[in-house]
């Protein structure tokens, strides 16, 4: 099945949002962290691959940052992050792990100097309430290493904070002019979870001021992350990717509404002491949906 407008919009927004957090005016990443990886049995990998888990989640894939991630050292030898040139070694930027062919073995020594996100980002297809009620959270602070332990129940419902959860809340079409052009009005909601109020204040302040910016629509099939959240075309730069679609569809940010959630009753009910903020992005896209 081909991706439709909503998938294109959500993935394009995610890439824009992720990149916005890495810009010099907010710089939500930590660089040059000593990182070691250890072998872990992962149930989500194909049977012909194995994984080594690093100490930090959500490595920065963007190449334009200071000290970009270029690869890892395996048994003392540098291995580039380009899977097409390194013998099918994949850097899983989302989970912070190295994925290798099964024949590589389980006794490798893998290290890196890593640049990691200070704010993790997730695309969510669940409601905010379900995420809060049904998920587990680890607030590791990206300057503090955290090792996956197989005795712990870390799965797809475990998220590492601070984090932003991005979801498409609503959308609708309004007739704009004769000829079939319509205005698609969409609302994307971002929920921010952390125990650090400084981080929440910084995020909502920065993104409140993005009102009236524009976002290039990047086709879903051009999403830069592929197998195990590795970069399809290495190195990856968001600005370079979006420049390929400057003549395509553009989405405008009409308004950004932000609010903090202060509810001791909610915190007691879910037994989680983090702070919550929401950001509602009201978006407008002029398009010909029936052509």
List where the protein language model places each region.
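Generic structural motif
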Residues: 77, 103-105, 113-117, 169-171, ...
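Residue-level recognition of well-ordered beta-strand positions that form the cores
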Residues: 111, 187-193, 278-284
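Surface-exposed beta-strand edges and their flanking turn/coil or helix-capping segments
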Residues: 113, 125, 179-181, 203-205, ...
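Broad, structure-driven detector of short, well-ordered beta-strand segments within folded domains
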Residues: 89-92, 164-168
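Acidic, Ser/Thr- and Gly-enriched intrinsically disordered low-complexity segments
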Residues: 151-167, 183-249, 289
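Short, charged interaction patches at domain edges and termini
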Residues: 1-34, 155-157, 169-184, 232-291
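Short N-terminal edge-element motif at the start of the domain
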Residues: 129-159
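Extended beta-strand solenoid/passenger and fiber regions
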Residues: 2-130
